[in-house]
């Protein structure tokens, strides 16, 4: 499973004991002009990767994370992308989860969330994008071109009444789901 949240420390012992395969990350949100290396999520993910990355015969992987476009800024997105390139880390993000998120990103940046993440280098590293409910045609091409893996979250999407991912089109496009 993949998880990005705030309290991974309590999860690690259970993950190790169960032997389950897991990509784990401390969620990153920022609403100001903070430097990436000053954020608690940066420190937590560096610690996670330093202490646990590759544990259980490689079954526990420490990823980097950007919660989403609307909970970050270009400076942070680019810093996470650079950190991933420098360390070989994978990245987890939420992408086009709701119509509001998707349309507001287009209003702010003139780009869909997928195009925005591509522009800022996130997809230069192996990436798992959660949700992907409101993708546009160009977004399928972006995800395929960069080998992005989509993690569908139907229970979450139903809870938010945000719709459901077009998995058949993803598969037809050659996207790993």
Annotated model-derived regions:
Residues 122-177:
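Active-site-adjacent C-terminal substructures of enzyme catalytic domains
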């Amino acid at each position: 499973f993949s998880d990005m949240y705030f309290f991974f420390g309590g999860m690690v012992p259970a993950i190790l004991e169960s032997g389950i395969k897991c990509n784990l990350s401390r969620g990153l949100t920022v609403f100001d002009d903070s430097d990436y290396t000053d954020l608690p999520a940066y420190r937590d993910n560096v610690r996670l990767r330093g202490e646990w990355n590759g544990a259980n015969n490689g079954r526990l992987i420490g990823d980097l994370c950007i919660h989403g476009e609307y909970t970050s800024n270009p400076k942070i997105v680019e810093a996470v992308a650079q950190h991933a390139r420098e360390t070989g880390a994978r990245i987890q993000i939420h992408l086009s989860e709701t119509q509001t998120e998707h349309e507001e990103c287009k209003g702010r940046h003139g780009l869909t969330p997928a195009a925005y993440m591509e522009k800022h280098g996130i997809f230069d590293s192996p990436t798992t994008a959660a949700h992907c409910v409101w993708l546009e045609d160009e977004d399928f091409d972006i995800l395929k071109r960069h080998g992005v893996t989509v993690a569908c979250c139907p229970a979450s999407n139903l809870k938010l009444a945000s719709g459901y991912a077009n998995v058949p089109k993803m598969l037809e496009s050659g996207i790993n789901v």
